[in-house]
Swiss-Prot record:
Organism: Escherichia coli (strain K12)
Domain of life: Bacteria
Name of the gene encoding the protein in the UniProt record: yshB
Induction pattern: In stationary phase (at protein level).
InterPro entries referenced in this protein's UniProt entry, alphabetically: YshB
Protein name: Uncharacterized protein YshB
């Protein structure tokens, strides 16, 4: 589950080229992984 989220985040970061969005997505994925 978490690996697929990370893959989506990394692919989205490459597409958008916006570090802030990538960082926010990584933090959200990390929180989801911790609390799930």
């Amino acid at each position: 589950m978490l690996e697929s989220i990370i893959n989506l985040v990394s692919s989205g970061a490459v597409d958008s080229h916006t570090p802030q969005t990538a960082v926010a997505a990584v933090l959200c994925a990390a929180m989801i992984g911790l609390f799930s």
